[in-house]
From Swiss-Prot:
Part of the 30S ribosomal subunit. This is Small ribosomal subunit protein uS17. One of the primary rRNA binding proteins, it binds specifically to the 5'-end of 16S ribosomal RNA. GO terms for molecular function: rRNA binding; structural constituent of ribosome. It holds the Pfam family Ribosomal_S17. Keywords: Ribonucleoprotein, Ribosomal protein, RNA-binding, rRNA-binding. It comes from Granulibacter bethesdensis (strain ATCC BAA-1260 / CGDNIH1). HAMAP family: Ribosomal_uS17_B (MF_01345_B).
């Protein structure tokens, strides 16, 4: 099973080798059918202390490092930090691109039917 990969923003880099990452996601409310933003904070391992507050990072699931830390930073502002998880990042990027392409295709089909 592939590891989960999330993209978020670093909100705190005050701990040694640990950053707090805020991951936003959008869901549809089941009753009102309105998009709602939900967010969650994850503690992620940053081996080289390279991440700073405000950086956009990708984190990947890993075996537990501590009680709260089960994620590792592998990508920061367009640069890969850990080559050990490169295949997980590539798989997630392919999955995201495929989802975006199918979403665009569905929007085009809906537009075509409406015209």
């Amino acid at each position: 099973m592939p590891r989960r990969v999330l993209t978020g923003r670093v909100t705190s880099d005050k701990m040694d080798k640990t950053v707090t990452v805020l991951v936003d996601r959008r869901i549809i409310h089941p009753l009102y059918k309105k998009f709602i933003r939900k967010s969650k904070k994850y503690a992620a391992h940053d081996e080289a202390n390279e991440c700073r507050e405000g950086d956009i990072v990708r984190i990947v699931e890993c075996p537990p490092i501590s009680k709260r830390k089960t994620w590792e930073v592998v990508w920061r502002n367009g640069h890969v930090l850990s080559t050990a998880h490169k295949e997980a990042i590539d798989a997630a990027a392919t999955q995201i691109a495929h989802a975006e392409a199918s979403g665009e295709a569905a929007a085009a089909a809906a537009e075509h039917q409406g015209a």
